[in-house]
């Protein structure tokens, strides 16, 4: 958690020896001391920029083609729960959303080629990849490419299927997308206030 505080102003102080007459204050002696180190505003800007860069969407552009929840299954036509979000994609790099670790890389009939990342109590899986770019155990930073979108596994066409779990329980990935959006908006607003 980052906090930002204003640095107190410093004033020039002159020690008087016993018996000396106190000099009259001048405008120069009353002025705040000039900062010689890094300016607090520059430090604040760096903090907000670092915070902005601490999160990323999994693709450069986000267009949800199938949301989380119940839907008509594209293979059976029956109502079925969709445990992730499908994003429109065409041969794009899949990016880590936050700092984390690659905990699983695999391939199966349903998810096709996939990679799973752990971000604290969250795990995020990116499925139907044409290629996985990260190995198990790799530490990733936000915006690190972990795969390339594709249409492997049980898929009707190229897209990115994103699933998310919190403490092992399936949750709607839009929770993370909303967090990323609010974090980036907060940072942009704070930076605009510093200009």
Task: Locate predicted features.
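Surface-exposed, glycine-biased beta-strand/turn segments
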Residues: 10-113, 142, 194-195
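Short strand-coil-strand connectors
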Residues: 51, 90, 118-120, 167
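Histidine-centered divalent metal-coordination motifs
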Residues: 82, 128, 159-163
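Short histidine-centered loop motifs in beta-beta connectors
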Residues: 95-96, 105, 120-143
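Short aromatic-centered micro-motifs
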Residues: 96, 117, 164
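Short, surface-exposed secondary-structure boundary micro-motifs
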Residues: 107, 145, 150-151
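Short aromatic-glycine-enriched beta-strand elements
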Residues: 110-116, 158-160
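Acidic, glycine-rich catalytic/binding loops that coordinate metals and/or anionic ligands
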Residues: 135, 142, 163-195
